[in-house]
Regions:
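Mid-to-C-terminal alpha-helical segments outside catalytic/metal-binding sites
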Residues: 1-14, 18-56, 60, 112, ...
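Catalytic pocket-lining loop regions of alpha/beta-barrel enzymes
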Residues: 121-122, 134-247
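Active-site gating/metal-coordination segments in enzymes
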Residues: 60, 68-165, 228
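Alpha-helical scaffolding within the catalytic cores
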Residues: 43-50, 77-83, 107-109, 180-183, ...
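Conserved, mostly hydrophobic/aromatic
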Residues: 12, 82, 95, 123, ...
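Catalytic metal-binding/acid-base residues of hydrolase active sites
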Residues: 14-16, 100, 128, 159-161, ...
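Short aromatic-enriched loop/helix-cap "lid" or pocket-rim segments at secondary-structure transitions
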Residues: 19-25, 75-76, 108-109, 166-169, ...
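Short, flexible/disordered intra-domain loops and linkers
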Residues: 25-28, 38-39, 71-74, 164-177
Length: 289
């Protein structure tokens, strides 16, 4: 991966469909999220299509599935397939994995194998969909131990989710699990764990900013929202106290980097801060520099 050639690193993209056409979520949840985000373009690009999309734009992308099989009954896109696609497109794709925390010891073993054999750089958790509190010691802490030990990254969805939005009962998805203060406990208990709080954390934006300011290992990605809707305090912190800890993320394919970047250019972000957010902070966190 040539850092000099890349204009940006998108730290938040999804592998929505496997090579066999299997989706990571059922159709109702996919359709609801498409309506919520007003998706432009193809909703379920293949891994190869995603690589080509980012290569055309001279961007790199962190890519992952979401394993929430215990809660949803739907198998995820295989982590191994995501990692293999990233290896085949190593100029643009960076593999993360996702492991249902309710897999227990089998999940812990799988996490270690994915790092050692497949070169996975981090793990995505979606507490809303997976149905767990990030600070539940009995459920997730053994996984965090492996992630901290291997020097990889734990990326947590925070705040409201478009998944299930508008579906009766929200599709059974509960928002309470994704308050970033639950991740504050994780950061305190695993002081060397590298953490990303994904998204502007509505309705807990101030909590996310407090956690990222207080805990050295905690970063924030800006995915899932058009920048024109960012809360003003998020923009203020990105320009100042958190200028080295805020990361560009789109949430592709539900939100394209083209749309995100066009709106980002309209924000009052300092010229010296823009390259940090778009590439430099992510490159350092991912160990690419």
């Amino acid at each position: 991966m040539d850092m000099g050639e890349l204009v940006a690193i998108d730290v938040h993209t999804h592998a929505e469909v496997s090579s066999k056409g299997h989706s990571s979520l059922d159709d109702d949840l996919h359709d609801a999220s498409s309506a919520y985000f007003k998706v432009e373009g193809k909703r379920k690009p293949t891994l190869e299509e995603t690589a080509a999309y980012y290569r055309e734009r001279k961007m790199a992308a962190v890519i992952f599935t979401v394993d929430a099989e215990s809660a949803t009954g739907t198998e995820p896109v295989p982590n191994e397939e995501v990692a293999e696609a990233a290896a085949a497109n190593a100029d643009v794709l960076i593999p993360f994995a996702s492991i249902d925390p309710f897999r227990g010891r089998a999940g812990v073993k799988q996490a270690r194998r994915l790092v050692e054999e497949y070169g996975v750089k981090g793990f995505k958790f979606h507490p809303n969909i997976q149905g767990f509190f990030p600070n539940d010691r009995a459920v997730a802490y053994d996984l965090y131990e492996v992630i901290e030990e291997t020097g990889t990254i734990a990326l947590f969805h925070t705040g409201q989710t478009g998944i299930g939005a508008g579906v009766p009962g929200g599709g059974g998805i509960r928002l309470k699990y994704s308050n970033p203060l639950h991740v504050d406990d994780v950061a305190a208990d695993f002081p060397h764990l590298k953490i990303i709080l994904a998204h502007p954390s509505f309705p807990w934006q101030d909590e996310a900013l407090a956690v990222a300011t207080h805990k050295p290992g905690v970063h924030i990605d800006l995915s899932g929202w058009s920048p024109k809707y960012f809360p003003p305090q998020l923009v203020q912190y990105a320009n100042t106290l958190l200028k080295d800890k805020v990361l560009f993320g789109s949430d592709y394919p539900v939100l394209t980097p083209d749309r995100w970047l066009a709106d980002f250019e309209k924000l009052p972000i300092k010229d010296e801060v823009k390259p940090k957010i778009l590439k430099e902070n992510a490159a350092r966190l991912l160990g690419l520099t």
